[in-house]
Amino acid sequence: RDLTMLSTPRPHDLVWLNSAAALEAIEEHWVAQHWRTSLPVVVRRDVDADARVPVGVRGMKREQRAAGWVRMENIVRTITPETFADRLLLLRSPLVSQPPVQAAISLTLHPWPWRWGITGGTGYALATEIPVLHAASDLDLLIRAPQPLDREALLAWQSRVAQLPCRADTQVETPAGAFALNEWLRDGRALLKTSRGVRLTATPWNREEA
């Protein structure tokens, strides 16, 4: 399922670069010491006048995060969050015994009416097989929602997520941006993260200028 990107990468996609010089506008000194091209960077939400792709670099420490930019021609490989929502892939992972991976496996046992994936530290660990997960690690989840989704189905998902063996948070990705599922189910509105900022909305599928 690894794809060479033919279209613009989306937030949370993991991308590999053809050289260290492909990372632009990085100021953090630790990146040069710890990051190498065998490790992916994660696409983040931002806009650039030069049509560069906004990315973030993860370090070995939780506080080590660096924002930068890359050009499309320097991306050589892409993995989407949905790649990891695969039971066989999860069962074969060296990290299969970790609670977030066990939690993800349990979610694959249900035929959900949408595409979903794994982001954050668990997605990064699955992609790199770097043992960064531990007993208290969270599971970050993403639901693709190009159209409004059935509320009852989302409540069923949230109920299943609440029973997982680790803390799990779900972001719902719409054409307008992304919002926290638990916030929207609880309040009827949520903070929508867009490439131009954040706005509070009850209609997260509607495109508006932030």
Locations of regions flagged by a protein language model:
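Conserved NTP-donor binding/palm subdomain of two-metal-ion nucleotidyltransferases/polymerases, i.e.
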Residues: 27, 40, 181-210
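Conserved catalytic core of two-metal-ion nucleotidyltransferases
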Residues: 162-194
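Short, solvent-exposed amphipathic alpha-helical segments in soluble enzyme
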Residues: 133, 157-161, 187
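Active-site nucleotide-donor binding segment shared across nucleotidyl transfer reactions
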Residues: 105-139, 143-149
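Short, charged/polar "capping" segments at the starts of alpha-helices
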Residues: 150-152, 179
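Helical scaffold of the NTase/Pol beta-like nucleotidyltransferase catalytic core
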Residues: 1-121, 154, 158-166, 170
